[in-house]
From Swiss-Prot:
Homotetramer. Hydrolyzes deoxynucleoside triphosphates (dNTPs) to the corresponding nucleoside monophosphates. Has a strong preference for dCTP and its analogs including 5-iodo-dCTP and 5-methyl-dCTP for which it may even have a higher efficiency. May protect DNA or RNA against the incorporation of these genotoxic nucleotide analogs through their catabolism. Mg(2+) binds at E62, E65, E94, D97. This is dCTP pyrophosphatase 1. Its cofactor is Mg(2+). GO terms for biological process: dCTP catabolic process; DNA protection; nucleoside triphosphate catabolic process. It is found in: Cytoplasm, Cytosol. It comes from Bos taurus.
Amino acid sequence: MSASEEMLGGARGESTTATGPFSFSSEPTLEDIRRLHAEFAAERDWEQFHQPRNLLLALVGEVGELAELFQWKPDEEPGPQAWSPRERAALQEELSDILIYLVALAARCRVDLPQAVLCKMDTNRRRYPVHLSRGSACKYTDLPHGATSENQAMGPADPASESTGQVST
């Protein structure tokens, strides 16, 4: 069975609508993807076209192609898990294109994506404390109990303000 057949539900068309939690395969890593794409581009002498602006525009174009797959689908539809094999293959291709361009853009901009994700998740944990955000779609600036800015949602930045109870601005 090829990797693409496995990702689409197997060579015999097994269902991909498992009800349990989903997890990604451990390989390839983001570094593997960066290297594979860099080799692919180098073999074709395409690095000259891979300036950040061009990579970003290609990424946005691929996001548009992904959006087209969802466009005009009814909201009550079960979702991509119930799509035809052809639609699922298109979904897989567009998501792959997006990841490839995202990794290439990050590499070109010298952003270590795994580390950036860890930092961003830490920021999000501070912005969206569980007790204020559980079940809410509110932006952190709109959370209840006076959390009206990132600094307030994350807590006081000035240690002196902790003793007075005032948040510095």
